[in-house]
Amino acid sequence: MNNLKQGKFITFEGGEGIGKSTQSQMLYEYLQSQNTPVILTREVGGTIVAEKMREILVHEELLPMSELFQAMAARYDHMARKIIPALQEGHIVICDRFIDSTVCYQGLELENGIDLVYNLHKTLMPSLMPDITFFIDVEPDTAIKRVNSRNMNNKFDIRGIDFYKKIYYCFKELSNRFPERIKTIKASDLSPLEVHELIKKHL
């Protein structure tokens, strides 16, 4: 899929409170235990510059188009400085969020936003898409209860159930659109370890 690289690019996607960061970490630790060259990173962020952009993106109220370009600028830095070099060295790269999150969080706020985001991404890095994406499928009602039970620390956490549903159904739509790349892991009633075992079966 990606002619820029020799390694493998794995992403985790979904809304807030679904456990994707936990699953990213668990997969990273598993691959390390197998002596597999692997790095773990995240978006928005992953580099010094991109992490600074993240602070603005998750805490400030931006205009929709400004928010999109902030996310894309951070991604370009992240890809150029971290993801692509690691892939070219033959590493597996695990990324907590990537392009599909930009589609659902920023693209939905704009007219024809889904296509706009993917087209922008292709313009930035035409060959770089994940080899496999795990959509951690947790029902919005369950997800928002989880978020409400923890210290909410960004503008996306504190939005209401309608926002959670919108994001959830966007990821569902993407998983239907790209079934070969996006693997849906139904996780509402599973423990983190059970979810991890399902993920390992797709590797």
Curated annotation (Swiss-Prot):
Catalysed reaction, written as an equation: dTMP + ATP = dTDP + ADP
Chain sites annotated for binding ATP: 14-21
EC number: 2.7.4.9
GO cellular component: cytosol
EC class name: transferase
One GO term of the biological process aspect: dTTP biosynthetic process
Keywords on record: ATP-binding, Kinase, Nucleotide biosynthesis, Nucleotide-binding, Transferase
A molecular function (GO) term: ATP binding
InterPro entries with a match to the protein in the record: P-loop_NTPase (IPR027417), Thymidylate_kin-like_dom (IPR039430), Thymidylate_kin_CS (IPR018095), Thymidylate_kinase (IPR018094)
Assigned protein family: Belongs to the thymidylate kinase family.
NCBIfam families per UniProt: DTMP_kinase (TIGR00041)
Function recorded in the entry: Phosphorylation of dTMP to form dTDP in both de novo and salvage pathways of dTTP synthesis.
Full protein name: Thymidylate kinase
Organism: Rickettsia rickettsii (strain Sheila Smith)
